């Protein structure tokens, strides 16, 4: 009998501190940086974001999302036999945030590791977890995207600091006799390393050089729309499906213009896209599971529907996962 994996529970968490565009405009104004709510909304679609308190780490956010996902799945932490955390902002250089999360959950003993593919991280992690479940290396996986991007933002650069927020999203993936995760497609192209990066070097546990995010927005935009379309068509071809067969498109919540451009290329209406970007900004690896959980809890995304998840991130990395909920 063939073995598959299926999502049986979702969860998400946003830290309490919520900054609207007006709040951020006021804070930046104190630094002599000019921007406006209109400028931010027009260019990004973002209206608010959440920032974690200084003593809150990625694993803390991951813990809250993981508990909700386990609750939704009707499982205990001890039922989990694999933990993968997608993050670019781990608690420390090592050990992995996944190991720290494992201890906080009380799920000690199972394999636990981090996966770093920036904003593509959750799609990568979900694909890896699916492969391990299909291979029999795990029966019940916890896959989390968690980020505290507020720690690596340059608040003197209005083109980047308005984009990102902190948060976490999680899913529980369980072995199944019927297909849940249908297929995935992952890609990377290292020649684009410099267009989205934190260029500092880590030495002795300290970041040397430039420790804040740098982005060539125009280059990212042009590349993102093309590779997202490629990834979507790749997974659809593997499954023998067409865009019209997809009930919901759940993209990385990066920028509304990128999301609209992708929908146009796939000839899918925005009414079939889950959009939560306006309320939490770009939360990197956390954005897709955040959007998925929100849509599930709102009753928009329902069991049996076909979902297309797609992401693009620094590296340059990109990918897509096609699944039935």
Curated annotation (Swiss-Prot):
It is found in: Cytoplasm. It comes from the Bacteria. Its EC number is 2.3.1.180. The last Arg residue of the ACP-binding site is essential for the weak association between ACP/AcpP and FabH. The active site is at 119, 252, 282. Catalyzes the condensation reaction of fatty acid synthesis by the addition to an acyl acceptor of two carbons from malonyl-ACP. Catalyzes the first condensation reaction which initiates fatty acid synthesis and may therefore play a role in governing the total rate of fatty acid production. Possesses both acetoacetyl-ACP synthase and acetyl transacylase activities. Its substrate specificity determines the biosynthesis of branched-chain and/or straight-chain of fatty acids. Belongs to the thiolase-like superfamily. FabH family. This is Beta-ketoacyl-[acyl-carrier-protein] synthase III. Pathway: Lipid metabolism; fatty acid biosynthesis. The keyword Membrane does not apply. It comes from Verminephrobacter eiseniae (strain EF01-2). Homodimer. InterPro entries: ACP_syn_III_C, ACP_syn_III_N, FabH, Thiolase-like. GO terms for biological process: fatty acid biosynthetic process. It catalyses: malonyl-[ACP] + acetyl-CoA + H(+) = 3-oxobutanoyl-[ACP] + CO2 + CoA. The gene is fabH. GO terms for cellular component: cytoplasm. SUPFAM superfamilies: Thiolase-like. One of its GO terms (molecular function) is beta-ketoacyl-acyl-carrier-protein synthase III activity.
